[in-house]
């Protein structure tokens, strides 16, 4: 019988940065800052279809850590100018580098939703990182959560889940330099939006990006991205649109307003 493992908590990481960062092998990775059910899998497949951009499945870097033995490895690493936090950054950096080497591409993108909880750490670890903020109407996010296969959560619980992502995502969007996108616009005008993304990343736009089914996107694996029939269709399909925010809680309605949906 398969053993169910607890998922990492959905909260912002508080990290003590006491040691300067080391040089990175990947100088300017790209991180998508987005909630669950926001269309980030479609975005990553479009980007991964570019000849110079590697956008793999969700990497979940924040849950990849190291353990140092007190008085031995801890002291040894400190003599080399590294603590646990910086060692983890070195490991994450190497993972990105290996994936770039394997793909033969130049730019790597990670779209893990959990990035919203470590955006400060990602910015600290990679001062030259680039950020894509992907928004979706809050009702679209909640409705998508409701429609998931096997969903048993109440509407209230799903809204609470969405808020856990929205709060740090909006904080990151207001703090960091980056490019803000809307899922609804990505599906309605994919060429225009992907052109904007390519311009931000400093690469020429390629029409092949829009036909993502013709490129190797990897396997559809649980917990590593969307596996719905919509994404598997290989076609960009219009997102659901919502005329108002009447069904949302007051707190979610505030995000809809802040993001230009009302």
List the predicted regions and their residue ranges.
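Glycine-rich phosphate-binding P-loop
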Residues: 33-47
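Short hydrophobic "helix-edge" motifs at membrane interfaces and signal-peptide entry regions
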Residues: 28-30, 40, 127-128
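PAPS-dependent sulfotransferases, especially Golgi type II membrane carbohydrate sulfotransferases
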Residues: 1-30, 170, 199-262
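Short, well-ordered beta-strand elements within core beta-sheets of diverse protein domains
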Residues: 31-34, 184-186
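Short, solvent-exposed loop/helix junctions and linker helices
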Residues: 26, 37, 187-188
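PAPS-dependent sulfation machinery
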Residues: 21-28, 45-121, 125, 230-258
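PAPS-dependent sulfotransferase catalytic domain
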Residues: 61, 67-70, 102-208, 219-234
């Amino acid at each position: 019988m398969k053993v169910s493992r607890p998922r990492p908590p959905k909260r912002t990481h508080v990290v003590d940065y006491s040691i300067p960062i080391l040089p990175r092998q990947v100088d300017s990775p790209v991180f998508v800052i987005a909630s669950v059910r926001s269309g980030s899998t479609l975005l990553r497949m479009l980007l991964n279809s570019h000849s110079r951009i590697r956008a793999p499945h969700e990497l979940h870097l924040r849950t990849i850590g190291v353990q140092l033995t007190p008085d031995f490895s801890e002291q040894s690493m400190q003599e080399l100018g590294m603590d646990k936090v910086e060692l983890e950054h070195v490991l994450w950096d190497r993972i990105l580098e290996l994936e770039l080497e394997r793909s033969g591409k130049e730019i790597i993108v990670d779209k893990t939703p959990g990035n919203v909880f470590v955006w400060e750490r990602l910015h600290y670890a990679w001062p030259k990182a680039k950020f894509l903020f992907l928004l979706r109407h809050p009702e679209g996010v909640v409705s998508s959560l409701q429609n998931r296969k096997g969903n048993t959560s109440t509407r209230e619980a799903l809204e609470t889940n969405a808020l856990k992502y929205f709060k740090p995502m909006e904080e990151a969007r207001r703090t960091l330099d980056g490019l803000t996108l809307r899922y609804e616009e990505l599906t309605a005008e994919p060429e225009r939006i992907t052109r904007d993304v390519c311009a931000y990343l400093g690469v020429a736009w390629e029409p092949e990006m829009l036909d993502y089914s013709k490129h190797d996107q990897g396997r559809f694996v649980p917990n590593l991205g969307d596996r719905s029939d919509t994404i598997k269709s290989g076609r960009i399909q219009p997102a659901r649109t919502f005329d108002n925010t009447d069904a949302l809680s007051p707190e979610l309605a505030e995000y809809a307003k802040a993001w230009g949906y009302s």
